[in-house]
């Protein structure tokens, strides 16, 4: 006969991953992420030594969203399959990876690009870096990496969902919060070495990617002209 002072099972009503070891929880989270069709990523990531704030919706064949460099430019990215577009304001295009004072001609040319979807070709030096922000597989492989001995950390709630944390290297190698309700998706990652914090939401929620209308696009065939980040 159970007494009224009996403690409630902390895993009651959960998916059960809270009972697993840290390595098992991490493996479940990784498997869930790999099997998802779509996700929304928001937070801070470090790429090639530079810090970027991102808010991207991603799926298998592309992605769309906003990227802003720390103390630097803000721009929008849209990718459908191999077609990558960048949208930014005139100030972004006026500087386009160049320093110093801009000429009147530079400013005039930049004004024509403001608010347009500029095609970034695969030959552009920045194509690989920019397209990585829109590639679900590439981003998830890079983000879901912990370094050091794993242990089960604290439980909390993220976006109203109960989570359990996997901690690596006593926290210095990263912290991954995994959903305890529904599929064990990773919901938040604090990357090791101060390399950013990213939240993951809307797992499996499909969305439509649309190619910009012809009048909204500019095809910059000149190598290096379509990015503004080639020097990053």
Describe each model-derived feature in a short phrase.
Residues 33-37, 88, 121, 147:
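Sec/Tat-exported extracytoplasmic proteins
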Residues 59-131, 196-200:
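An acidic-aromatic
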Residues 37-45, 50-67, 73-77, 82-86, ...:
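One face of beta-strands
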Residues 131-142:
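Transition segment at domain starts
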Residues 34, 70, 157-159:
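Surface-exposed coil/turn segments at beta-strand junctions on protein surfaces, enriched
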Residues 1-53, 214-216, 221-232:
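N-terminal leader/targeting segments and the immediate start of mature chains
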Residues 153-216:
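Gly/Pro-enriched, hydrophobic low-complexity segments
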Residues 143-151:
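A short, amphipathic edge element
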């Amino acid at each position: 006969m159970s007494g009224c002072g009996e403690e409630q099972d902390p895993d009651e009503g959960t998916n059960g991953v809270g009972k697993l070891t840290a390595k098992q929880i991490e493996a479940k989270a990784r498997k869930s992420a790999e099997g998802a069709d779509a996700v929304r990523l928001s937070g801070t990531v470090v790429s090639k030594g530079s810090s970027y704030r991102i808010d991207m919706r991603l799926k298998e064949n592309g992605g769309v969203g906003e990227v802003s460099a720390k103390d630097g430019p803000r721009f929008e990215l849209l990718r459908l399959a191999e077609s990558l577009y960048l949208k930014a304001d005139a100030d972004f295009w006026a500087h386009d990876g160049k320093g110093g004072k801009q000429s009147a001609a530079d400013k005039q040319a930049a004004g024509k690009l403001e608010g347009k979807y500029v095609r970034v070709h695969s030959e552009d030096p920045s194509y690989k870096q920019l397209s990585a922000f829109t590639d679900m597989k590439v981003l998830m492989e890079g983000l879901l990496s912990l370094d050091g001995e794993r242990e089960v950390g604290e439980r909390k709630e993220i976006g109203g969902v109960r989570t359990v944390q996997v901690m690596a290297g006593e926290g210095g190698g990263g912290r991954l919060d995994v959903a305890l309700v529904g599929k064990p998706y990773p919901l938040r990652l604090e990357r090791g070495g101060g390399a950013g914090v990213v939240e993951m939401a809307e797992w499996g929620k499909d969305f439509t990617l649309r190619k910009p209308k012809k009048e909204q696009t500019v095809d910059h065939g000149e190598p290096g002209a379509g990015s503004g980040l080639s020097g990053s």
